[in-house]
Amino acid sequence: EKGEFMAVYYLRDRFELLDSGTFWLSETPDKVSRGWDGACNRTVTWVELKDRKSGKEFFYFNTHLDHKGKAAREEGVKLLIEKIHEIAGKKAPAIVGGDFNTPVDSPIFKPLTKYMVSARAKAATTDHKGTFNGFGSAPDTIVIDHLYYRGKLKCQLFATLDGNYGAPYISDHYPIAMVFTL
């Protein structure tokens, strides 16, 4: 009924949760809803965290754009940007990550890359592995999962976590990660 859940996991001994919320990628983001030409109800879950060591704060937005609707992906990115400005302001450090169901060179990212940078492209250490595996049925070159950031963050590492975790595939996507400093 409500659609998918975009979980955000964090180390509670390292970070303090200051605020959190969810919105739907649709024309009515505050209501359970399916947007534009989307096949599914899609959401964004966000958190505001405070680093217990440094006292610095940042925002993280986790999303999953629609896999079928092109307009849903395009409008979803625009809404995501609007909500980041509304929730985090225009300057606070922020990270956006998730399954965008869109290759990195797609024009869908143009509005996002006007004020955020790709962790994969800017990290001091990165990889060029595919992120979608289709439970073994897809070529290992498809990259549709992304991390973007803005503000006073420095990205040291971007990694596609394609190791064996006790099963050949834990999902149809490999997890992605970034290591950063505030």
Language-model segments: what does each one mean?
Residues E1-E57, T160-L161:
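Structured beta-strand-rich core segments of catalytic domains in phosphoester-bond hydrolases
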Residues M6-V8, V44-E48, N62, H146-L147, ...:
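Conserved hydrophobic/aromatic beta-strand scaffold that supports enzyme active sites
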Residues E1, K68, N101:
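Glycine-/small-residue-rich active-site loops that bind phosphorylated ligands and cofactors
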Residues A39-N41, K50-E74, K78:
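Metal-dependent phosphoester/phosphodiester hydrolase catalytic core
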